[in-house]
């Protein structure tokens, strides 16, 4: 407080450049160039010439929503005279400003004394409590007054363009609003305004309906064109006039009212001054005290809620009624708390708030389209079935409102019911398109049938088909069980080599050998199935070979099997090789059998080879043999059989002499190879040199050379 009195609270005022820049930003460049004193004199003369009846008629007949009309001009003239008289040094310090009896009583009170001008308002809504918190004003409520005592000073000031007094502030050494330097009586010393500079105040923009509401300040706000410094200078001029009055004059009944608080402008200082607490019947705080401590927060929240108006054009009428009742309750609650006059006294502002910010974005035709789309959703011949909970909820609300209306007195309100257009609903059965023999299909969906996208075709099947499919499923499951059982036996047999290497004693070795024989016998029995002797169950073996895991298992089992049983396995494989090749198109697992088949073929005799070659070539037609030879495993197996035959014939053993059956089978295979094109022949897994040498035994020179050139160019090994 001492720093404000001494003038040390505004160190920035010492910098002239900042002040000039601030004045230019506030008033505009060249605002003080014109003769503002001459304008004051001219406006004062105009005011004296106006008759009192004319002023009264203009004040009473002006509309409420005319914020910048004739009333503001009258207020401007009165303020001009105030400023002019305040600046005349000939007036005594304690003199009162007298006016003619013809002036409007709504502007000048009955005691013919000018009352302190109330502070201006900014355009934003601020409650008195927020101003007290922000500027540190005193919290003493002003005395109430009648509505007839509200003068033109409570009205909004004109814009800068129409008021040279406000737009062009006087250039003087001491700013307007500086307290007078003359002495005062002891009773008045406690209420001196200590702020040496113009003030910058924000206040509430509305007054309440009751005349004794402390939160009511002004009816209309300042125009938005006025800068904060201009408003502060106006307040400073009024403060000087009020300070020149004696304490006895403030005690008169016509002069009581809130007075200006001392607040330093935020634009020119870093802190806010405080006001001396009022004593006795001296100065009152300029801004009133709110009716409750939480009035500021509550009013702000209510304003924010009222500004947000949801678009309820598409809602149920019950929804609209509920929202309207809530709005009425808020307005009543706001009127009880002293803030309800804001909307009733400002119809222009209320109309502005009600204006839809999104108006004009849609054409009327587009709005009708949206309404029709929304009504389509409400069309229902059975609302309780389509929207059961919605209907019951609003039935309960209607019953509750009816019961409340019965308890009240007055006319009964008619219930609003939603009326939707009646649309004839045609009952029809949905029949999707049927495709015979298909598992599922996509059908055309619609709004009435959105879920029926897939309709499974129910095809009638005979008992024979079902029995056959069941047998196939059971057979495949049985084959998988057999493969797992044989694999477990195979793993045990392969593990015996490790166990033999770890065995040291002979007795233990014999035990392991016996156990190995048992495991091998179990494996052979599984391959034979129900067959007797050294024969393999052909159907079971083919099912095993149709599964990729079974093929790899057979390739590992063949070296462990006895020779006769292994030869039987090769014979069945050669006999069904064309079928196995077709089943192996995706797996491509047959080539893994080539190495183990070669080990078994090296132990077979010529009659066994003849039987195997006959199963491969003789039992099939020429076309089937061509298909086998175009497969990599089939061509490799043929080369391996011919290579073993060449070895037996080259050994000179009389038991291994060529037989007529063997010769015819070799010639048949050679002619088939000559008919297959070079591009169709695959690359075998073994060398064809030995096979070509064996072919030369039974072919002439020409065919032998052709076959040699074809196989050599195809395989690239010659």
Swiss-Prot record:
One of its GO terms (molecular function) is G-quadruplex RNA binding. GO terms for cellular component: cytoplasm; nuclear speck; P-body; PML body. Residues 144-157 have a biased composition (Basic and acidic residues). Its main location: cytoplasm. The keyword Cytoplasm applies. The keyword Lipoprotein does not apply. It is found in: Cytoplasm, P-body; Nucleus; Nucleus, PML body; Nucleus speckle. The modification Phosphoserine is found at residue 62. GO terms for biological process: deadenylation-dependent decapping of nuclear-transcribed mRNA; negative regulation of cytoplasmic mRNA processing body assembly; negative regulation of translation; P-body assembly. InterPro entries: Pat1-like, PAT1_dom. Residues 9-23 have a biased composition (Acidic residues). Keywords: Cytoplasm, Nucleus, Phosphoprotein, RNA-binding. It comes from the Eukaryota. Residues 1-30, 139-188, 327-347 are annotated as: Disordered. Interacts with ribonucleoprotein complex components. RNA-binding protein involved in deadenylation-dependent decapping of mRNAs, leading to the degradation of mRNAs. Acts as a scaffold protein that connects deadenylation and decapping machinery. Required for cytoplasmic mRNA processing body (P-body) assembly. When tethered to a reporter mRNA, able to repress translation. Belongs to the PAT1 family. This is Protein PAT1 homolog 1. It comes from Xenopus laevis (African clawed frog).
